[in-house]
Amino acid sequence: MNSTESRAAIKALIAKAQICGLHHHPEINEQSRDLIRTADQEKRMLHKREIESICTQSGTNHEAIAFMISEAANYVDRCKQTLQTRQAHLFEEGGALHPTERSEACWRDCWNFLRLASYAMASDTPECTDASGIQAVRQLYALMNVPAAGMTLALQTLSQLVTCLLYTSPSPRDS
């Protein structure tokens, strides 16, 4: 594949790599789906009123969700630290996350997965991904030589941090 074909393939996969599957989820009410759709299209976390509205509909604890969102940057920073400690070779010259632009893309992806997790937690919907979007992400990662083991470690770290938060804060189901 030449560079023009490669760029076209990457561009097509980026367009397909929409991972949020909550926009049409039948167990989420229409108002909550609309709020999630808007936030997802704008690639942002939920705002306070959106959190409160979605949590009221789903019966989840808006304070726990708001706290998790307020800590998002810290969680991504801890993922960076974990990955840099456990897989330092990825950041060295010749590593899959070198130069800095490549590692910054990894952190953006972590933030986006965390963003999706916040929507899922607020709506109390664990099945939150779009299968075709996830498949496109996998293809994109393969095409761009994203280190799968590194991304897996980063996402596992994120999951552990959020799980720890949920166990140490009031239950997300408490109102």
Where are these regions (language model features)?
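Heme-based O2/NO sensor domains and their adjacent alpha-helical segments
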Residues: 45-155
